[in-house]
Amino acid sequence: MPFQKHVYYPLANSPEGPDASAIGAAPMAFVPPSAASGPLPFFQFRPRLESVDWRRLSAIDVDKVAGAVDVLTLQENIMNITFCKLEDEKCPHCQSGVDPVLLKLIRLAQLTIEYLMHSQEFLTSQLNLVEERLRLSLLDYEQSKQLLTKQAGEIKLLKEECKRRKKMLSTQQLMIEAKASYYQCHFCDKAFMNQAFLQSHIQRRHTEDSHLEYNTKAQTDRLQKEIDMLKEQLQLTRSQLESAQHSHAVRFSKDYEMQKSKEEDFLKLFDRWKEEEKEKLLEEMEKVKGMFMREFKELTSKNSALEYQLLEIQKSNIQIKSNIGTLRDVTELREDHLPCPQDFQNMLQLLDSQASKWTDRFQVLNEEHSKEKGQLLSHIEKLRSSMMKDLSADNVFYKRRVEELGQKLQEQNELIISQKQQIREFASKPYSSISELKGTPLTRQTLEPKSAAPTTPMTASATQNLDGASSLTMVHEQVFSSHILEPIEELSSEEEKGRENEQKLNKKTSLRKPSSTSPSPQELRTNLERELGNKLRSFGIGANIQGIPCEILNRSLKAMQVARHDLAKQMPDIQQIRESLEHQLICKMEEKVSLSSDRHHVPSMTTFPPEEVPKATQLPHKSRPLVRQRTVFTDKVSVPKLKKNTKESHFLRRFPSTKTPPFSSEEEPDEEDLLHAYLSPDSLATAATQPPKSSMSHFGKSAVKSDTDWTEGSEMDDSDFSPKLTGTSITIQTDTVETMALPQGSGNKAVPGMNPADTVIKKESLQELKCTDADDEDWDISSLEEEKSLGSKIEQREPPPAKRDPSCTQVQRAWGPVNPREFKEEGLHENEPSTLKSNLVTVTDWSDVLDV
C-alpha cells in the first residue's frame, strides 16, 4: 500500500531514480478530515507570503538526512520551504537580491511540491472512500451469508413439514375411503370389516382385557375429573402468582426508579465535581504555560541579541563576494568561525535542564492529581455503599412498621365489626330489654335517692369504642351523641305499681352489683383519665396540648358537612323525616302540657326556708312517679328573628331543643354509640340558685341560630368535654319537664307564696343563663371557673337566701361522692319550684378530666 498511517509513500517500482524515491519517500502532509467526505475542490496555487527561516535551514544537515532517510525532518520543514517568499531576500554582505535563475528554480520546486501535496490529499480521500465501500460490501456480504444460511435452514424445515403433512393426508384419505368397514381392535393391531367380527375377536382373544377395560374407564373418568380440578386449582394459583408478581414488579420498578433517580443525582454531582477539577487543572496548566512562555520569550530575546552581535562581527570580518559565493561563505563562516562556542553550549545545557525540570514538575502534578482523584473516587464509593446500607435498613424498618400498623388496623377493624354486631343485636331485641342492658343499675340509682352509693362515672369502654383510625369528625359526632338527653314520660298507676314490684324484687341485685363490682369513684376517675390519655396519645394529641388548633377544627367540620350533604343526597326524603318526627314530638308535648294544666291549677304559694319546708312538699321516694327513658335525639330548632316574641310567650308549649339527627332511625345503632348520662343533683341545684344574668333577648338570639351553626358550635364544645353543652341542650329541656310535672309531684298540695307566672319567668331566665355561645373558640377555659365567677358575681349583686346550703353555691364534680342528705333535703326552694330535679339525668362533667 502506498499509504500508511494517512501518509503517502510512493511505490518501489516507480520510474524515478533512487534519489527521487528517497526524496519522494518523505511524508508530504497529513490528510485533513474533510478529504474523506467527497472530491476535493478545484486546485489553485497558494500565494507565498512567509519569510525564510535561515537559522532553521542552516541547522539541517542534508547529507545526513539523505543517508538516514530522515522523513520527519523533511515533514517539519516542508511547509516553510514550499510557501516561503524569496524575492525580498538579500545577501547580508552585498545587500543584493537572489539570482533570478536560482529564484526560478526554487519557485518551480515549490509549485511541484504543492501539486504533489494536492495529489496526496486527493489520493488519500479516494483511498478512504474505497476503503469505506469495501467495508460496507463486506458487511453486506456477511449479512447476505447469514440470511442465506437462515433461509436454507427454513427450507429444510419446510421440506420436513411437507413430508409430514403428506403422510398425514395419505392416512386421512385411507381412513375416509375405508369408512365403516374398518374397525380397529383396542388391544392389538388387527382390523376387521364389521363390528361382529371385532366383538367375536375380543371375546375369543381378549376376554380378561375386556373386563379390565370397563374398570379402566371408570378410573380414567375419575382421574380425568381430578385432573380437571387440579387444572382449575393450577389456573387459580397461576392467576394469584401473576397478580403477586405484577404487584412485586410494580413495587420493584418504583424502587428501581427511585434508586435510578438517586444514582442520576449522584452522577450529576460527580460530573460537576469532575468539571470543577478539570477547570482547576486547566487553570494550573495555563499558569505553567504562561511561565514557560515568559521564560521562552526571555531566551528568544537573549538569542536575538547574540545573533545581532554575531551579524555585526560577520559584517566586519567577511569580504563582499558574488551572490552564490556569499551564501556558501556565510555557511562556512558559521560552521568554522562560531563566536563563543562555550556560551552556546551553556545555553543549550540550561535549556535542557529547564525542560527536564518542568517535565518532572508536570509529572509530579499529574501524579498528585491522580492520587487525589483516586482518593475522591474511593470516598465516593464508601459514601455510596453506606447510603445503600442506610436505605436497606430504612426499607426493612418501614416494612416492619407497615406490617405492625396493618396488624393494628386489622385488630381495630375486627373490634369495630364486633361492636357493630353487638349494637345490631341490642337493636333487634325488645325495648325493655335494651333499657335493662344499657343502664338498669344506673337509672335505678338515679331514681332511688335514698341509696348512698356514689354516681357511677362513665367506664373506659366508652372511650374504647372510638376507632383509632377514624378522623376527628367522628370523635366529635360520638361525643355529641353522648350529650343528648332522653325525655321523661310519666306512667299510669298500674304501670307504676308493676314497676315498683319489679324494683323491689331486683333492688338487691341492681344496687349491690355496682357497689360490689365497681371500684371507688377515685379509682374510676384515675382509670378513666388513663384510658382517655392513652386514646388521645393514639390520636397524636399529647398531654401538654390544651386544645385542638382552629385549622384542624375547621377542616374536620367541613368534612362533617360534606358527609352530611352526601347522606342527604343518598336519602332525598331525610328532611321530610326530620319534619315529621319534630311535628309528632311537639304535638305530644303540647298534649301533655295541656292535660297537666287542665287537671291541676297552682294557686299562689309562699316560700319556706330549706330547713322549714313541710313534709308534704318534700317528695319521698315512693311517692315520686317512676319515669321511663326513651332514646330521642335532640337539637335546636332554628327560629326566625321576626317571631322571637311569640316563641318566647309560648316557650312552655314548645320544646326548643328538638331536632332529628342527620341520619335515619334505622342507622342509629350502626353509626353512633349512645353514652349513658349520670345524675348530678348538686350541679342542678347550683344552676337553679343562679339568678338571670342578661335579658331574654340573649336567649332569643342564641335560639335563632341556624342549624349548621348550632351543630358546629356544639361539636366544638363537645370536643373539649366542657359542660357548656349541658347548659344549652339539657337545662332547657329539664325546666320544661319540671313545669309539666309540677302539679303531679306536689301531690295537689299548694305551697303558698309561689306564682306560676313567676315560675315561668324564673325558668326562662335560667334558660337564658345556661345558653352559651356555640361559636366560642376559646377551648382552654374551664367551665368550673366560669360557674365560680358567675356565682361570685351573683353573690355581689343579690344576697343569697338565709341558711342556704354552701354546697349549692358551687358546682360539685360528678367524680366526687354523693351526699345522701342532698337527696333527702331536696325540695321546693326559692329558685327550685320543681320536685323532679333529683330524677333528671345530666351529663358528666368531662372538663374535670381535661383539668387533670
Swiss-Prot record:
Region annotation Disordered: where it falls in the sequence: 434-463, 489-524, 597-623, 648-672, 685-726, 772-837
Keyword terms: Cell projection, Cilium, Cilium biogenesis/degradation, Coiled coil, Cytoplasm, Cytoskeleton, Developmental protein, Differentiation, Metal-binding, Nucleus, Phosphoprotein, Spermatogenesis, Zinc, Zinc-finger
Disrupted-gene phenotype: Male animals were all infertile. Few spermatozoa were collected from the epididymides of the mutant, and no motile spermatozoa were seen. Light microscopy of the mutant spermatozoa showed severe morphologic abnormalities, primarily absent flagella as well as residual cytoplasm and abnormal heads.
Impact reported for residue 520 to D: Phosphorylation mimicking mutant. Increased interaction with GDI2
Expression sites (tissue/organ): Expressed in testis and undifferentiated ES cells.
Region of interest (Mediates interaction with GLI3 and localization to the cilium basal body), residue spans: 1-351
Compositionally biased spans, kind Low complexity: 451-463
Coiled-coil residue windows: 214-307, 385-429, 488-508
Gene3D superfamilies, A to Z: Classic Zinc Finger
Residue span of region Required for interaction with DAZ1: 139-262
PTM info: Phosphorylation at Ser-210 by PLK1 before mitosis prevents interaction with PCM1 and localization to centriolar satellites. Thereby, it negatively regulates the localization of the BBSome to centriolar satellites. Undergoes postmitotic phosphorylation at Ser-520 by GSK3B. That phosphorylated form of DZIP1 interacts with GDI2, disrupting its interaction with RAB8A, leading to RAB8A activation and localization to the cilium where it mediates protein transport and participates to cilium biogenesis.
Zinc finger region(s), C2H2-type: 183-206
Subunit and interaction comment: Interacts with DAZ1. Interacts with the BBSome; recruits the BBSome to centriolar satellites of the cilium. Interacts with PCM1; localizes DZIP1 and the associated BBSome to centriolar satellites. Interacts with RAB8A (GDP-bound inactive form); recruits RAB8A to the basal body of the cilium and prevents its inhibition by GDI2. Interacts with GDI2; negatively regulates the interaction of GDI2 with GDP-bound RAB8A. Interacts with GLI3; retains GLI3 within the cytoplasm. Interacts with CEP164. Interacts with IFT88.
Function: Molecular adapter that recruits protein complexes required for cilium assembly and function to the cilium basal body. At the exit of mitosis, localizes to the basal body and ciliary base of the forming primary cilium where it recruits and activates RAB8A to direct vesicle-mediated transport of proteins to the cilium. Also recruits the BBSome, a complex involved in cilium biogenesis, by bridging it to PCM1 at the centriolar satellites of the cilium.
Family: Belongs to the DZIP C2H2-type zinc-finger protein family.
Protein name: Cilium assembly protein DZIP1
Organism: Mus musculus (Mouse)
